[in-house]
Every structure is written in C-alpha cells, then in structure tokens.
C-alpha cells in the first residue's frame, strides 16, 4: 500500500503542475492583452475557477494567434521573451530589426493605400486579383539531411519562417523535403501543372539546400556523383512554353544555397579601379533567335543568397542569415515597397561585411512591371 501511494504521488504532482501552468498561461494571455479583451471579459477569466478558465477564455478569443503563440512559448518554457530573438551580428550595418518577437509581424497595407497605388501606377504594376477569387500557390523545397554532405542544421527555422511569411502574403504553401535532383524536378513539373495557377496572380518558389555554382544539390550529391538540379531547369519548367497558367504573372524564385566555396570578402584599397572599355554593338549585326509571338522567359526574378562562386552562411540555432533578413524586410516593407525595393533592403542589410560576408544577388530579372504584394488586400 505504501508503495502504491508513493507511485501515485508523482502523478498528482504532474496534474497539479499542469493545472498551474495552464492557469498561468491563461492569465498571461489576459494580462498581456494578447486577446484584446474588454474589462468585463478579463474579470470573468480572473474570477473563474481553475477548471473553467479555458472554457471562459475560448468564449472570448479574438484573432490574435501569433501573439498568443509567443506568450505560450514564453510561459511554457519559462524564458525571457528576448531570448528567442534572431539578431544581426553587432558589426553589421544598421538595418532592419531581426527580432522574431511581437514586433516581427507582417505589416499590412491599408486598403486606401492599395487603391491609391493601383490608381497612380496603373499600367506600371502587375495586376492583383481579388482576394476572394485568387488561388495563390507557393512551393518550398528544403533539403536538410544528405547522404554524403553535412546536415544543414537550423534549416527547420527557415522553413517555418518562410511558410509563415508566404501564408501571411496570401499563398497556400506546399513544403517538400529530402529530395534528390530528380525528385525536385518532378515536384516542379507537378507544381507547374497545378490548376490553381490559372486563377492566381503570381507564385513563389523557394529553394534551400547545399548548392554549387550552377544549381541546387539533391540529397545524394557528392563530388564523385553529382546530384544537382540546374537553375536552368527551374526557369524552363515555369516559362511561357511549359507553364501557360503563369504567363504574364510574377514568378519569384528565392534561393538559399552556396554558389561556390569562396568567402565573398576581399581587402581593397581606396583607389578606384581602371574603367573597362564599354561594350557597344551595332543594331545591324543583331539577329532574332526566336519566332515566338510571346517571350519564352518573362516575368521572372531570382533572388540568391550570395554572389556566384561564394558561400552563404547559416546559424545552426537561428537559421540562415539571408532568410532571416529577407523575412524581416518583407514584414517591414512589403506593405509600401514593390518587390525589387524589398530585395534591395535585404542587400543593404548585408552592405557592410562582417566576420562572415555574403551579398544577396538579383538574377535573371525579366519582370516588365513592378510587383506589389499589398499584404492584407
């Protein structure tokens, strides 16, 4: 009997701790005004019996999921809210705050601003479909574990951050992981064939893996037996010949991968280099290479985490530097800046080389208009 009593005590202790934890969590929700409750509603929760707190709170919930989740993490893990923030290295150029705390939320574009920009820049911007009618899709491909290369520790944070960002921008996000180059190509063709693109106004393709100059590494890659998805394959799959559903619509490609082994930094003098001879070409020497009535490759923009031949850096506890700053800049500026301006904000945050240097680069830009995302519209 004494043994049975001894065995039951830990269960009772756990039950008691669980009730106290949940009660404290609910009180934190109310105290920090996460749910924006009226005073009368707050009083009901404070005064409710322990077993009734959850029911009373559910009856009063508002649309504050993200803040509520952060309060939950802070209460559950008993950590300071600043301990989970992702911060730029101290020596980087003053740029966007990279905290993922309560301030790191997607700023929405006021409807009046949306209407104003659409009117003032009509003909200069890509048209945005009505939210109720559009079916935006986004694809994230991320390889973390490899057969012959080290794991990409911290990549899970990149997936989570990009998925939340794209969903906030109105995209239904498909995530694919652990893919060989052949698997990646198969996923791309299937995604390009999705019917939803017909009623969409754009798409995002996000690739996160090890990489080389010409492509993205699959899970079986090695120097002896390369397993690489060429960048050309991505553009070919979604061009106007193979993906008519996205014709004349922005196709945004985000790449977090090394593009070589160089460190991307160099000691230089203040003396300007000699100017190279300018390149000129007479129009009489130009010939057409295609007879299509529409451009084969148009409305693309690729944003890579580094310049060619250079590495990209990833914090194993916080995620990739590029993805972290990309998300921050979207959250801060997508409401008022077009896509190329947002990308420039990201580049500016890397402008001053730190201990680990890299410079994100825009490539194969064939967008003929400005692409505003107008979050919230």
Swiss-Prot record:
Membrane topology: Peripheral membrane protein
One GO MF term attached to the UniProt entry: cysteine-type endopeptidase activity
Subcellular localization, as worded in the UniProt entry: Cytoplasm, Cytosol; Cytoplasm; Endoplasmic reticulum membrane; Mitochondrion
Annotated propeptide span(s): 1-80, 271-289
Reaction catalysed by this enzyme: Strict requirement for Asp at the P1 position. It has a preferred cleavage sequence of Tyr-Val-Ala-Asp-|- but also cleaves at Asp-Glu-Val-Asp-|-
Post-translational modification (record): In response to activation signals, undergoes autoproteolytic cleavage and activation.
Region listing for Required for LPS-binding, in residue ranges: 1-59
Entry annotated with the keyword Metal-binding: no
InterPro entries: CARD, Caspase-like_dom_sf, Caspase_cys_AS, Caspase_his_AS, DEATH-like_dom_sf, Pept_C14, Pept_C14_caspase, Pept_C14_p10
Active-site residues, as the UniProt record annotates them: 210, 258
GO annotation, cellular component aspect: canonical inflammasome complex; endoplasmic reticulum membrane; extracellular region; mitochondrion
Start and end residues of each CARD domain: 1-91
Top-level EC class as recorded in UniProt: hydrolase
Site (Cleavage): 289-290
Regulation: Activated by homooligomerization induced by direct binding to cytosolic LPS, in a TLR4-independent manner. In addition to LPS, CASP4/CASP11 may also be activated by oxidized phospholipid 1-palmitoyl-2-arachidonoyl- sn-glycero-3-phosphorylcholine, an oxidized phospholipid (oxPAPC), in dendritic cells, promoting adaptive immunity. The role of oxPAPC is however unclear and another report suggests that oxPAPC competes with LPS-binding and inhibits the non-canonical inflammasome in macrophages.
Subunit structure: Heterotetramer that consists of two anti-parallel arranged heterodimers, each one formed by a 20 kDa (Caspase-4 subunit p20) and a 10 kDa (Caspase-4 subunit p10) subunit. Upon direct LPS-binding, forms large homooligomers, resulting in its activation. These oligomers are often referred to as 'non-canonical inflammasomes'. In its precursor form, interacts with TMEM214; this interaction is required for association with the endoplasmic reticulum membrane. Interacts with CASP1. Interacts with NOD2. Interacts with Serpinb1a, Serpinb1b and Serpinb1c; these interactions regulate CASP4 activity.
Domain comment as written in the entry: The CARD domain mediates LPS recognition and homooligomerization.
Known role: Inflammatory caspase that acts as the effector of the non-canonical inflammasome by mediating lipopolysaccharide (LPS)-induced pyroptosis. Also indirectly activates the NLRP3 and NLRP6 inflammasomes. Acts as a thiol protease that cleaves a tetrapeptide after an Asp residue at position P1: catalyzes cleavage of CGAS, GSDMD and IL18. Effector of the non-canonical inflammasome independently of NLRP3 inflammasome and CASP1: the non-canonical inflammasome promotes pyroptosis through GSDMD cleavage without involving secretion of cytokine IL1B.
Family affiliation: Belongs to the peptidase C14A family.
Name of protein: Caspase-4
Native source species: Bos taurus (Bovine)
Gene for this chain: CASP4
């Amino acid at each position: 009997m004494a043994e049975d009593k001894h065995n039951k005590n830990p269960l009772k202790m756990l039950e008691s701790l669980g009730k106290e934890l949940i009660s404290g969590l609910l009180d934190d929700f109310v105290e920090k005004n996460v749910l924006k409750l009226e005073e009368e509603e707050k009083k009901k929760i404070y005064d409710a019996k322990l077993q009734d707190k959850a029911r009373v709170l559910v009856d009063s919930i508002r649309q504050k999921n993200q803040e509520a989740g952060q309060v939950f993490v802070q209460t559950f893990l008993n950590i300071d809210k600043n301990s989970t923030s992702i911060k730029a290295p101290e020596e980087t150029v003053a740029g966007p705050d990279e905290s993922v705390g309560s301030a790191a939320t997607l700023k929405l574009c006021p409807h009046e601003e949306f209407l104003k920009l659409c009117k003032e820049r009509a003909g200069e911007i890509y048209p945005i479909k009505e939210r109720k009618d559009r079916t935006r899709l986004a694809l994230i491909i991320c390889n973390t574990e490899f057969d012959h290369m080290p794991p990409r520790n911290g990549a899970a944070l990149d997936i989570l951050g990009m998925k939340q960002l794209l969903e906030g921008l109105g995209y239904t996000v498909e995530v694919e992981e652990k893919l060989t180059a052949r698997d990646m190509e198969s996923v791309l063709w299937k995604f390009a064939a999705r019917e939803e693109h017909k009623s969409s106004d754009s798409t995002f393709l996000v690739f996160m893996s090890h990489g080389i100059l010409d492509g993205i590494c699959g899970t079986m890659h090695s120097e002896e037996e390369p397993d690489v998805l060429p960048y050309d394959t991505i553009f070919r799959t979604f061009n106007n010949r193979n993906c008519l559903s996205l014709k004349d619509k922005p196709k945004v490609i985000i790449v977090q991968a090394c593009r070589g082994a160089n460190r991307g930094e160099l000691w230089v003098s203040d003396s300007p280099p000699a100017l190279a001879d300018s390149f000129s070409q007479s129009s009489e020497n130009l010939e057409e290479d295609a007879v299509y009535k529409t451009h084969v490759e148009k409305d693309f923009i690729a944003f890579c985490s580094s310049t060619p031949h250079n590495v990209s850096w990833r914090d194993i506890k916080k995620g990739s530097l590029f993805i972290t700053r990309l998300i921050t800049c979207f959250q801060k500026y997508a409401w008022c800046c077009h896509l190329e301006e947002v990308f420039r904000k990201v580049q500016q945050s890397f402008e001053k080389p730190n201990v680990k240097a890299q410079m994100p680069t825009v490539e194969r830009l064939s967008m003929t208009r400005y692409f505003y995302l107008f979050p919230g519209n």
